[in-house]
From Swiss-Prot:
Subunit structure: NDH is composed of at least 16 different subunits, 5 of which are encoded in the nucleus.
Keywords: Chloroplast, Membrane, NAD, NADP, Plastid, Plastoquinone, Quinone, Thylakoid, Translocase, Transmembrane, Transmembrane helix, Transport
Single GO term (MF): NADH dehydrogenase (ubiquinone) activity
Record protein name field: NAD(P)H-quinone oxidoreductase subunit 5, chloroplastic
Primary site of residence: plastid
Keyword Thylakoid in record: yes
Organism for this UniProt entry: Flaveria ramosissima
Gene expressing this chain: ndhF
InterPro entries listed in its UniProt record: NADH_UbQ_OxRdtase_chlpt_su5_C, NADHpl_OxRdtase_5_subgr, ND/Mrp_TM, NU5C-like, Proton_antipo_N
Name of one Pfam family that matches: Proton_antipo_C
Compartments, record wording: Plastid, Chloroplast thylakoid membrane
Length: 741
């Protein structure tokens, strides 16, 4: 066992040769390197698989022995300064390593087909492999300096992948937004690290925790300064894990390829912030009020992310806000001191969210055959619907991921989320009410995404698809009512069903309206995709290839069964509790991990009832209302009610505007921060040019002007200069005489 731990340092470096060799190959032998590009993808998967096997071996030993292994190399510069590097293997490291490798392998396999038509195929795999290396280095770090180094590398890889299609202005802007937002958090993290080093004199976790606990117990530190340093450390996690108010980069990050969205949201960048707080938990729990602050940020993020997901039309952005909300649950659990629940939900959510993102990628891939390559169209749920019979495997897998995130037993997320919800009652009733109500919102918006995507009819066929937004059908509201802003107010469904010659086809017509053959020219392509140019596009979507379906099918058993790892039916069977021994749990300090069946059943019924209510509301609003003639009277009755629905419409429109405009946080930043910084820069420029430079320039100009006047008066004659000279001397002598008289 000791020998296995000794070679654990190789974990983060095994995937590293792939990006290095790809980079050298593209520089020195570009043609040959591109000709064997599938071989590089195979090597990426192979090396990451070796890391996964090694991580699983370490995890088995962790479960059996609950040991912690740390190895440190010291580089002594002089008697006062030494640099220490090492690796730390504990339960948190082994859990994160398995999570990163399993999700990473499946995403790489999926990407082989998804990115096969992209000219940046090799560049993508180089970034992905380096991303895995950086994240593995982060979770195995034994001190804060290594944490910060790999933290920055993780951020760099995410920026490269978010802006992977950098020729698209929106992708380049999203990359810049992620970079600037995370700069704020990373700067806080750096200041926090330096602050705690100044207090304790150590970067190593063990020494840092021990020294700091002694200082706190002896009351030898300034609590205000310590709290400030802790908040700065936590700021790094806020930005990385997209917590309020530094969450604004996450939805825009969906401009990157879908596989990287799955990796970022499941096992890498956003998980890094949760990992950091979990790693520093022994530090945070002894600082007054910092745990309360963490839980406060978590509960705000939970509710904020859920409300922002309610009206998203982009399928990936809807899932992105879902990730934000679920990360808020994890942060809430950490703030409550429920360490096990937070990591449990991190595991279950990772596999469910990876399944959902890969499923959404399959949907987008199939929609591109209809609308051409244009993310605004292929990712727009308004144009989807009715995909059940076209992509049945994707549909069923997406449904499982949706039900898991909704909290339906016995799927994975039910067990972990239910544990967090139950713990929230012990911590704060107010937080518990918000968390439980948000669970209902989660079920609502996830079911909404599923219904808009897969149920009903294929909406893209119900208009003369030319990219214009002036057709009535394009404005089908996502709130279950007609879109009055764009649609004709006198438009009725009966009229729609009668249109067969001059308008869009009937929902029940066997005739299929042909799409514009030049739809691919609406957006300037930045990658070359066969069949997406000026050629005719397909009339119906089709299921993805086996290479893309295989990872989706692999994630299904994870979504079904990974939750059973943490079910405390019996102390000997609860693998997660044994894995995390010793664990931090401030809410159940004397717990013996045995389940109270009555409490469990009561809480489970309540939790499932709330989720079922959210699903029912979503089904009522977003069910395929055009699927039968029986719905015609119902819809027209809603339309005819007129003024009676004005108040409820105002409420729904307010909620819709809040959600669709991202809670106005982006507008606030744009108005006050961006404009404020620009105004400050303009004022600084004015002050520098007019005041700072104006004073010496003014003195110089006055001196030059006086000299020119004197020069013009003198006329260039020596006799004139002598006359003025003696005149001034005489004047000064007279003044001196009268002053001393």
């Amino acid at each position: 066992m000791e020998q296995t731990y000794q070679y654990a340092w190789i974990i983060p470096f095994l995937p590293l040769p792939v990006p290095m060799l790809i980079g050298l190959g593209l520089l020195l032998f570009p043609t040959a390197t591109k000709s064997i590009r599938r071989m590089w993808a195979f090597q990426s998967v192979l090396l990451l698989s070796i890391v996964m096997i090694f991580s699983m071996n370490l995890s088995i030993q962790q479960i059996n022995s609950s040991s912690v292994y740390q190895y440190v190399w010291s580089w002594i510069i002089n008697n006062d300064i030494s640099l220490e590097f090492g690796y730390l293997i504990d339960p948190l490291t082994s859990i994160m390593s398995i999570l990163i490798t399993t999700v990473g392998i499946m995403v790489l396999i999926y990407s082989d087909n998804y990115m096969s038509h992209d000219h940046g195929y090799l560049r993508f795999f180089a970034y992905m492999s380096f991303f895995s290396t950086s994240m593995l280095g982060l979770v195995t770090s034994s001190n804060l300096i290594q944490i910060y180094i790999f933290w920055e590398l993780v951020g760099m890889c995410s920026y490269l992948l978010i802006g992977f299609w950098f020729t698209r202005p929106v992708a380049a802007k999203a990359c810049q937004k992620a970079f600037v937002t995370n700069r704020v958090g990373d700067f806080g993290l750096l200041l926090g690290i330096l602050g705690f080093y100044w207090i304790t004199g150590s970067f190593e976790f063990r020494d840092l925790f021990q020294i700091f606990n002694n200082l706190i117990s002896n009351n030898e530190v300034n609590l205000l300064f310590v709290t400030l340093c802790a908040v700065l450390l936590f700021a790094g996690a806020i930005a990385k894990s997209a917590q309020f108010p530094l969450h604004v980069w996450l939805p825009d990050a969906m401009e990157g390829p879908t596989p990287i969205s799955a990796l970022i949201h499941a096992a890498t960048m956003v998980a890094a912030g949760i990992f950091l707080v979990a790693r520093l938990m022994p530090l945070f729990i002894v600082i007054p009020h910092i745990m309360n602050f963490i839980s406060l940020i978590g509960i705000i993020t939970v509710f904020f992310g859920a409300t922002l997901a309610l009206a998203q039309k982009d399928i990936k952005r809807g899932l992105a806000y879902s990730t934000m909300s679920q990360l808020g649950y994890m942060m809430l659990a950490l703030g409550m001191g429920s360490y096990r629940s937070a990591l449990f939900h991190l595991i279950t959510h990772a596999y469910s969210k990876a399944l959902l993102f890969l499923g959404s990628g399959s949907v987008i891939h199939s929609m591109e055959t209809l609308v051409g390559y244009c993310p605004k169209k292929s990712q727009n749920m308004v144009l989807m619907g009715g995909l059940t019979k076209h992509v049945p495997i994707t549909k069923n897998s997406f449904l499982l991921g949706t039900l898991s995130l909704c909290g339906i037993p016995p799927l994975a997320c039910f067990w972990s989320k239910d544990e967090i919800l139950n713990d929230s009652w012990l911590y704060s009733p107010i937080f518990a009410i918000i968390a439980w109500s948000t669970a209902g919102l989660t079920a609502f918006y996830m079911c909404r995404i599923y219904l808009l995507t897969f149920e009903g009819h294929l909406n893209v066929h119900f208009q003369n698809y030319s990219g214009k937004r002036n057709t009535p059908l394009y404005s089908i509201s996502l709130w279950g009512k007609e879109g009055s802003k764009i649609s004709n107010k006198n438009f009725r469904l009966v009229t729609l069903l009668k249109m067969k010659k001059n308008g869009p086809p009937s929902f029940f017509s066997n005739k299929v309206y042909k799409m514009d053959e030049n739809v691919g020219n609406l957006v300037q392509p930045f990658i070359s995709i066969p069949n997406f140019g000026n050629t005719k596009t397909s009339l119906y979507p089709y299921e993805s290839d086996n290479t893309m379906l295989f990872p989706i099918l692999i994630f299904i058993p994870f979504t079904l069964f990974v939750g059973f790892l943490g079910i405390p039916f019996n102390q000997d069977v609860d693998i997660l509790s044994k894995w995390l021994t010793p664990s931090i749990n401030l809410l159940h300090k004397n717990s013996n991990n045995l389940i109270d069946w009555y409490e469990f059943s009561k809480d489970a019924v309540f939790s499932v009832s709330i989720a079922s209510f959210g699903i029912f509301i979503a089904f009522f609003l977003y069910k395929p209302v055009y699927s039968s003639f029986q719905n015609l009277d119902l819809i027209n009755s809603f339309v005819k009610m007129g003024p009676k629905r004005i108040f409820s419409d105002k409420i729904k429109n307010a909620i819709y505007d809040w959600s669709y405009n991202r809670g106005y946080i982006d507008a606030f930043y744009g108005t006050f921060l961006t404009v404020g910084v620009r105004k400050l820069a303009e004022f600084t420029h004015f002050f520098d040019r007019r005041i700072i430079d104006g004073i010496p320039n003014g003195v110089g100009f006055i001196s030059f002007f006086v000299a020119e006047v004197i020069k013009s008066v003198g006329g260039g004659r020596i006799s004139s200069y002598l006359f003025f000279y003696f005149s001034y001397v005489s004047i000064f002598l007279l003044i001196y005489y009268f002053l001393n008289f």
